[in-house]
Amino acid sequence: SDLSASQNTEYLQSIGAVIHFGHHEAHIDNAEVVVYSSAVKPNENPETMAAQEHGIPIIRRAEMLAEISRLNYTLAIAGTHGKTTTTSLCGLVLMKGGIDPTVIVGGRLNGLGGTNARLGKGEWTVVEADEYDRSFLQLFPTIAIINNIEAEHLDIYGTAEEVQKAFIEFSSKVPFYGFVAVGLDDAGIRSMLPHINKKVVTFGLSRQCDIRAIDIIPHERSTEFTVIAHGEKLGVVHLNIPGEYNVKNALASITVGLHLGIPFATIAESLKEFGGVYRRFEIKGMNNDILIVDDYAHHPTELKSALSAARSGWKERRIVAVFQPHTYTRTRDFYKEFGLSFDDADIVLITDVYAAREQKIEGVSGELIAQAAKNAGHRHVHYVPNLADIESKVRGLMQAGDLVITLGAGDITKLSDSLLSAE
C-alpha cells in the first residue's frame, strides 16, 4: 500500500500487483509478512499495528533486502553519492559477463526495461546499500564498494564522525575471502582507510589507485578514458554517460568485474551499452534547441558533479539550473555548501524545500540557499518559493541554445517534462 499513486505503483499494477492507496488494517488479510519502509512508523501505522496484533512478522525493508541477498554471494554498493549508478553499472557488467546476477537498485534502470530489479539464476546478488537510517548495516556483503563518504543524513547520525563510523562497521561485515573496493580520490575514504581491517582494493584517478583512469575525454553524452589496472594498461572505455564522477562509478564496476574474471573487453562493451538510470543526468530531449536534463542531485557535491558534467559536455550552451532543496534538515545543515555549488551554472533558480518525511523548520527555506549563492558571488540567482510559479519564470529566462537542468530528489522532475512537451 502507499498513500498515493506514482509511476512505481502504476508499473507494479501493470504486472499484476494489487496496490492499495491509503493504509487500513484490512489490507494485511492473508499476509505472511508485512514489510515497511523507513518512512513508516510501525507503532502508528494501522497495517503494521494490525500485523503485530495478529502475530504476523513485520520487518523493515532493509531487513528484507538482507534476507534476500544472503541467499547468494552479495556485492553491496555504498557511499554518500553514486550508489544507484554504480549498482546499475555493476549489475550490467555481471550480466554481460555471464554471471546472471540478481540485481536490486534504488532507481529505475533503463537496461532493465525501466524497473529497479531483476531476478537472476546465478550465485551473485548486486544490491544498493543505503546508509540512511543505518539500513546498510543489515547486509553481509561478500564484496563491498564504498564510493565516497561525506556528512549526510545528519538528522540520523548527528555528526560526520558518526557517518564514518557506520561505514567502518559496514566494511567490517565483509568476510576474509571478500574485499572492500574504495574510491581513493575521496577525502572521507582516505581518512577511513586505516580503520578498515579487510582486504582493500582502490579505484579512482590518483596514481596510487589499483584500478585507475587516465586520458579522460568528455563528450556531450559520453566519456572516454583509458584504464590502468595494477600498472598495466588494459584499454579504452567509451562510457555511455557523461561526467568525471561517472568515470569513478564505472571504475568501481571495472574493479569488481576484473576480480570476478570477466574479460576487460566484455566490461568495456557493457559500459559502452549502458542505458543510464532514471533521473541520473537523464537527458530528456530537445525543445526548440533547448536541451532538457533532469537529475536527482540533492547534496552539494552532487549538484557540483551534475553541473560540471553539463559544463564539460556542452561548453557552448548557457546552463540554466533549477534546484528544489530536499528536506528541511539537509537545507539547514548545508545551505552554505549548497550556495557554493552553482559555479558552472549561468543562471540559477531555487524553489522552496520539498519536505519529504519532515515537518517544516521555522526559518529554513530555499531562500537560505539562494542568499548563500549570492553571498558567494553568483551573479544570476533567483528565488522562486512557489513551485507553481517556477515554470513561467524559467520560460521567461531561457532561450534557444540553452541547457536547462532540473535538480532535486522531490517533484521538480515534473518541470522537466513540462518544459520538454510545451510548444
Model-identified regions with their sequence ranges:
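Short internal beta-strands
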Residues: 1-3, 179-184, 320-323, 344-355
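N-terminal leader/targeting and accessory segments in enzymes
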Residues: 1-60, 64, 234, 242
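Beta-strand->loop->alpha-helix junctions that form or flank phosphate-binding loops
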Residues: 2-4, 20-23, 59-63, 104-106, ...
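Phosphate-binding loop of NTP-binding sites
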Residues: 27-29, 38-184, 188-199, 251, ...
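Structural beta-sheet core signal
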Residues: 103, 144, 182, 202, ...
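Nucleotide phosphate-binding/pyrophosphate-handling subdomain across enzymes
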Residues: 219-221, 229-347, 371
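C-terminal helical cap/extension that packs against the catalytic core
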Residues: 339-400
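A glycine-rich beta-strand to alpha-helix segment
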Residues: 389-420
